[in-house]
């Protein structure tokens, strides 16, 4: 396995670790509605950071974006909005299925759809079955799905041991939302593929290959921001029991602490895709669709590791922990299979 491929896998792991940890600062926010907290964190992760970093990277910010026609930008933006819808469905999935089953189904679906639909849309799917490297990467995707399923089962055992139930358990609603979440969340993978002309243009300007994907985030995350912020603002304006005015009426020290924690959560959220771009840059051109599989499977892996480190599995018994460790090992095996497939 070559060094660039190993680096690509490593950076995807770092990005996934940031994704697994980003909600920790949000948990420190007190006496704010979820909508206010998510909007502030999201404003930094979807707007401030993508724009600031692109402004710093690009020699002429406005000329760069003005060089693309609407036929190029609109699909990227819409795929970003599609991914934003997936974000909203994610929370609803947890409500109706619980964390473990919800994550298992949603991540499993988005891993498969986001990974395999890209080569299908490119007309390259049959090529994967006809080459040893393609066959091995497909095997790695299958093993990753199995690993995600095992970790999710471990989480289900943990929830049962701790007596945790979904807020409003509904298998029918939850399954529909989980599948929708998985499909729509794959929009980020499609957006990255559609943004290749933007990556090429950034590289032509002399931008380091590790950073060429970052300017496209202005458009991709712009689509996601409109969906997420619109959803939050509508709820703040129409739902009884929550209001921006009430959230901002808290004592000044609490306001400052809440704002800092929300911003930190937003920064950590953005870092997952910052390092996703680094990992993506090191993946061979014929296998860029694998980036999504690596990111999502490592996200589940890192979520399990973070749970162990924070002693969330302390009182659940040995079987759930053994299943968690087994699932993590299977995901690591999947990453190695995919890496070997890309190296063939």
Curated annotation (Swiss-Prot):
The chain crosses the membrane at residues 4-24, 38-58, 68-88, 101-121, 137-157, 175-195, 214-234, 255-275, 290-310, 324-344. This is L-rhamnose-proton symporter. It is a multi-pass membrane protein. InterPro entries: L-rhamnose-proton_sym_RhaT. GO terms for cellular component: plasma membrane. Belongs to the L-rhamnose transporter (TC 2.A.7.6) family. It comes from Pectobacterium atrosepticum (strain SCRI 1043 / ATCC BAA-672) (Erwinia carotovora subsp. atroseptica). Uptake of L-rhamnose across the cytoplasmic membrane with the concomitant transport of protons into the cell (symport system). It catalyses: L-rhamnopyranose(in) + H(+)(in) = L-rhamnopyranose(out) + H(+)(out). It is found in: Cell inner membrane. Its main location: membrane.
């Amino acid at each position: 396995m070559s060094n660039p491929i190993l680096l690509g896998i490593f950076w995807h792991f770092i990005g996934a670790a940031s994704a697994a940890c980003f909600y920790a600062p949000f948990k420190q926010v007190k006496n704010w509605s979820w909508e206010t907290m998510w909007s502030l964190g999201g404003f930094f992760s979807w707007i401030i950071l993508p724009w600031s970093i692109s402004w710093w990277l690009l020699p002429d910010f406005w000329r760069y974006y003005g060089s693309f026609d609407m036929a190029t930008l609109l699909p990227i933006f819409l795929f970003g909005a599609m991914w934003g819808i997936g974000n909203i469905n994610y929370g609803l999935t947890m409500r109706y299925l619980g964390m473990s089953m919800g994550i298992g189904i949603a991540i499993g679906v988005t891993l498969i759809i986001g990974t395999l639909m890209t080569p299908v849309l490119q007309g390259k799917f049959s090529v994967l079955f006809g080459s040893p490297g393609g066959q091995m990467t497909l095997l790695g995707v299958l093993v990753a799905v199995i690993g995600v399923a095992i970790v999710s089962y471990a989480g289900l055992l943990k929830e049962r041991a701790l007596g945790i139930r979904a807020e409003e358990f509904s298998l029918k609603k939850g399954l529909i939302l989980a599948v929708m979440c998985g499909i729509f969340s794959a929009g980020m993978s499609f957006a990255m593929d559609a943004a290749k002309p933007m990556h090429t243009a950034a590289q032509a300007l002399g931008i380091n290959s590790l950073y060429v994907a970052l300017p496209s985030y202005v458009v991709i995350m712009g689509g996601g921001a409109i969906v997420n912020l619109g959803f939050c603002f509508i709820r703040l304006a129409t739902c009884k029991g929550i209001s921006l005015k009430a959230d901002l009426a808290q004592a000044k020290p609490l306001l400052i602490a809440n704002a800092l924690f929300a911003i930190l959560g937003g920064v950590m959220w953005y870092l997952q895709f910052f390092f996703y771009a680094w990992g993506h840059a090191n993946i061979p051109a014929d296998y860029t669709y694998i980036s999504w599989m690596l990111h999502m499977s490592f996200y589940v892996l890192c979520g399990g590791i973070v749970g162990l480190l924070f002693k969330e599995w302390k009182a659940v018994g040995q079987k759930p922990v053994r299943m968690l460790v087994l699932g993590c090992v299977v995901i690591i095996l999947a990453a190695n299979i995919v890496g070997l497939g890309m190296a063939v």
